[in-house]
Amino acid sequence: MLTIRSFASIPGGTDLTALYRAEVGDYPKFFKMDTACKLGFLLAERLADEPRFMPREDRAVLMFSTCGSLCNDRHYEESVWEFPSPSLFVYTLPNIITGEIAIRNKYEGETSAYVLERFDPGTFVAVVEQAFQDGVTGSALCGWVDARSDDDFTAFAFLVERNGPGQAFNVENLYGTVNQ
């Protein structure tokens, strides 16, 4: 059985730099990230468990959104008119969020990003359950990070475990947790 070990969210409009300085403060690469990556990074920091920064092949990172990297794609498109910015280009793929989280935390399990037409708890739960079918995955950091602009976003994440403490990871509990 999969369980929700912990949950974190960041309300839309939150000053992400102030949040970073208050809660993390020791990862200068944060300032190069696009909004979606900053959100994913901060959610992962809130959900991180001990021990930190040790290789873990049993931890998957799965992120979902409707916007993908659209917010940063717009910034990159604007930069092309002057001079294309390599520092923006790297963030024009939705899976960069999972990569940033995995690199920071040394997670070596599956990393996947899914762009959906809309938030669909049934699909969310089914995809996360599928990740646990490999026999290696024991936990997953999974979330919804939808950055429509630098201050208009929806962001929440779960730490889901196989047979861990907490409530069952299913559609009903997903709805209940997100809508608290």
List each model region and its residues.
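Conserved "HGTGT" condensation-loop signature of ketosynthase/thiolase-family condensing enzymes
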Residues: 1-137, 141-180
